[in-house]
């Protein structure tokens, strides 16, 4: 395929046109008075959203050179979303500001490499200062504030803070579509896996069709149990304690299952059997998780253990187990807290190492089950369009809240970026590196300027007053008042602000140091076939 090539100023200018088109589309959504953008969908109703990364991903430009610039900014938004889960619009605004200011200086003869070094030094100083002025987030109210700011809904803030309180910071919080109009929270505490009882005759509550075991022993094995003689010595030991037993095995069949059911019906023994969750290596890992949570040992050939030799020492324990036809929930396992903490640390390190989104999702699920449970926020709305928009907002809020708990919070509304200007301005740099620093100084003002503009105020006036105000005081664009941002609840997670600035500077520097751009030439359209002469159609 033939290529189209542009050099130097022509290359950069074409890319910057694409940057501007995308950024101008996205930045109208910034702040409490930000507008919405309507996205056409190939099927179904249009999507109305103010989520920066969702808008950025939809933009595809006809000009190949402009499209490359737009795609680079879209990459900034996506990367910021992946790291922090929010701040995508801020990242886009910062990228545009750095690129615009940088291009002016490069066109005027400045060295792009020197500018890049200055930008990197200034951003490092800004990030250090952000961490210095950060405040830790703890307590239900503080978490609710962060979530409410990101989602623009106090009710959503309450749901997220309650969910995090119930399942812990590492717990899984999923967002699903509700069948009704109302948004609601549902929490499953303890370790849940999608395997139900092997026989309905094992239920203890015939009305609800569930089996509830109080203070049970738990046998965990990756073997198939077909012969009751294999586990008979262990069953006799458990029977002496007068406590119920949960059996988690590869399968229970043959004579073993009817024997267990018969003893259950006669009232001799309260026992429930379920299949082991997962498949292959993931099954082994999940069984090990259950064993650590309950203080038991997996009976497996990998450890040289056999069912017929199993003793009471291999059994796990928990406060309660609930089993229905589809799922099993283990509540308050008796495992050692330090062993559970070690297991959690191992899973976290595996999550950082993996490059597969699917594997990361499965590891996150395992982490949640060990850490305390799963919460589901069921989103309700009057129309499908409103439902999609609400779901995106709640996802952003959840990610922002997790980021806030992890690294703390700073004043929101772009105020924190203006607060670090003094520290960045104090850097002693020379030549083009000083120019790079000045570019960052100008860019740090841009989010506040855009938020003010979207709300109908003059950004320059707001920024000048903000620079003279104490750290923490800022402009509430929602009502036009000057307030203590943190006290009022206008806050941003440090991780979000930091990621937006770092990713914006990284991609903007790449654009400024670009000297040639190679694009595919569009393929010429194939000529349309001429219509067939009617006289050649045989009179049909």
Swiss-Prot record:
CDD domains named among the record's database cross-references: GroEL
Catalyzed reactions per annotation: ATP + H2O + a folded polypeptide = ADP + phosphate + an unfolded polypeptide
GO biological process: protein refolding
Record keywords, A-Z: ATP-binding, Chaperone, Cytoplasm, Isomerase, Nucleotide-binding
Top-level taxonomic group: Bacteria
Positions contributing to ATP binding: 29-32, 86-90, 413, 476-478, 492
Single GO term (MF): ATP-dependent protein folding chaperone
EC number per UniProt: 5.6.1.7
PROSITE patterns named in the record: CHAPERONINS_CPN60
Cell compartment(s), UniProt: Cytoplasm
GO CC terms of this entry: cytoplasm
Main enzyme class: isomerase
Protein family membership: Belongs to the chaperonin (HSP60) family.
Protein purpose: Together with its co-chaperonin GroES, plays an essential role in assisting protein folding. The GroEL-GroES system forms a nano-cage that allows encapsulation of the non-native substrate proteins and provides a physical environment optimized to promote and accelerate protein folding.
PANTHER family: 60 KDA HEAT SHOCK PROTEIN, MITOCHONDRIAL
Name of the molecule in the record: Chaperonin GroEL
Organism this protein belongs to: Streptococcus agalactiae serotype V (strain ATCC BAA-611 / 2603 V/R)
